[in-house]
UniProtKB/Swiss-Prot annotation:
Family: Belongs to the FAH family.
SUPFAM superfamilies, per database record: FAH, Fumarylacetoacetate hydrolase, FAH, N-terminal domain
Organism (species): Bos taurus
Ligand binding (substrate): 128, 142, 240, 244, 350
GO biological processes: homogentisate catabolic process; L-phenylalanine catabolic process; lipid metabolic process; tyrosine catabolic process
GO function term, MF aspect, one: metal ion binding
Positions where Phosphoserine occurs in the chain: 92, 309, 417
Assigned EC number: 3.7.1.2
Reactions performed catalytically: 4-fumarylacetoacetate + H2O = acetoacetate + fumarate + H(+)
Pathway: Amino-acid degradation; L-phenylalanine degradation; acetoacetate and fumarate from L-phenylalanine: step 6/6
Principal EC category: hydrolase
UniProt protein name: Fumarylacetoacetase
């Protein structure tokens, strides 16, 4: 229990302590903080208190404007920081609790803070690791007999996304322009995307990287995973459909990707690890692991259109539905010798479950635009309209507490005029 008041339904109890980057009106410099209740603990103010065997020589990482340097220190440093912070914030520890002047400088309300991307993202990779999602999309476009491509059950399929257009929650997303071919009997056209979609995803930040040419073995993969965020992989389905053969997604994805600002450390999630999915056929040996690394994370997506007084929940899913684990994703990414770096972002792909209400995108929820998704008050959607706000949330439910991620939200702006 912490001396900082924390509501029972708060995403950020002392069991969580996610890391983020924030600024305030009084101090516009972006800096590292930890969320506790509705407060932010400014680690740049208390960096001198990190006197453990590792962090005593690296206190300056908490004075940086991003988490990259801290991520790069590795698992032992993360564990040292977490243990220290949980002790410092506990109700029985007087060091910060009873120092009124330090508390006034160290704590900021989340409501008064501006949040930033938690790290400088050098590279971003998006996987395609939900069997339910891959099957549904395959059925739509190739038929039931050819739903999964021949490689899908043998490796975690992925593509390299655009790191420069990853934005923090609350950043508006402009409806993209591009080339489409809505009528297969006619030439392609240029214009504003008409089939704009969201994708419910999660992503993890890489900690220490690997040298070029030296793969990360799956037995060591967990040492390279810093923590997780929510992600909305915004998608222009009509642009994507026309462009993706033969090299995969390009402009249909690269216009915007939203992540939540707080990075939940893996140690906060480990109590919610569940058995890995059964994989048949068994993967090749380099992808096999026994360590449970699938997590029971409740996820939901709400949509609020213009004129709606409150958002309507249109999807409830769970991260435990993923077929390929993060350990497998990271190991496969590096198996050819590709070098990962601190702050790299690796995403899950759309998280869909077995039931229609757990489908993680409008493409599935509307089944390729053939079904209307009810929002209430007579409003429906097949794809996203201008002014729609998509709000993603997620949490693990503990006994009397929850480990949450905050929000991953973004509002659709109209496309720019085009010639």
């Amino acid at each position: 229990m912490s001396f900082v008041p924390v509501a029972e339904d708060s995403d950020f109890p002392i069991h969580n302590l996610p890391y983020g980057v924030f600024s305030t009106r009084g101090n516009p410099r972006p800096r590292i903080g930890v969320a506790i209740g509705d407060q932010i603990l400014d680690l740049s103010v208390i960096k001198h208190l990190f006197t453990g065997p590792i962090l005593s020589g690296h206190q300056d990482v908490f004075n940086k404007p991003t988490l990259n340097s801290f991520m790069g220190l590795g698992q032992a440093a993360w564990k040292e920081a977490r243990a220290f912070l949980q002790n410092l914030l506990s109700a029985s520890q007087a060091r910060l609790r009873d120092d009124v002047e330090l508390r006034q400088r160290a704590f900021t309300s989340q409501a008064s803070a501006t949040m930033y991307l938690p790290a400088t993202i050098g590279d971003y990779t998006d996987f395609y690791s939900s069997r339910h999602h891959a099957t549904n999309v395959g059925v739509m476009f190739r038929g039931k007999e050819n739903a999964l491509m021949p490689n899908w059950l043998h490796l975690p399929v992925g593509y390299h996304g655009r790191a420069s257009s990853v934005v923090v929650s609350g950043t508006p997303i402009r409806r993209p322009l591009g080339q489409m071919r809505p009528d297969d009997s006619k030439p392609p056209v240029y214009g504003a995307c008409k089939l704009l979609d969201f994708e419910l995803e999660m992503a993890f930040f890489v900690g220490p990287g690997n040298k070029l040419g030296e793969p990360i073995p799956i037995s060591k993969a967990h040492e390279h995973i810093f923590g997780m965020v929510l992600m909305n992989d915004w998608s222009a389905r009509d642009i994507q459909k026309w462009e993706y053969v033969p090299l995969g997604p390009f402009l249909g994805k690269s216009f915007g990707t939203t992540i939540s600002p707080w990075v939940v450390p893996m140690d906060a999630l480990m109590p919610f690890a569940v058995s890995n999915p059964e994989q048949d056929p068994k993967p090749l040996p380099y992808l096999c692991h026994d360590q449970p690394y699938t997590f029971d994370i409740n996820l939901s997506v709400a949509l609020k259109g213009e004129g709606m007084s409150q958002a309507a929940t249109i999807c409830r899913s769970n991260f435990k539905y993923m077929y390929w684990t993060m350990l497998q994703q990271l190991t496969h990414h590096s198996v050819n010798g590709c070098n990962l770096q601190p702050g790299d972002l690796l995403a899950s792909g759309t998280i869909s479950g077995p039931e229609p209400e757990s489908f993680g995108c409008m493409l599935e929820l509307s089944w390729k635009g053939t079904r209307a998704v009810e929002l209430g008050n007579g409003q429906t959607r097949k794809f996203l309209l201008d002014g729609d706000e998509v709000i993603m949330t997620g949490h693990c439910q503990g006994d009397g507490y929850r480990i949450g991620f905050g929000q991953c939200a973004g509002k659709v702006l109209p496309a720019l005029s085009f010639a």
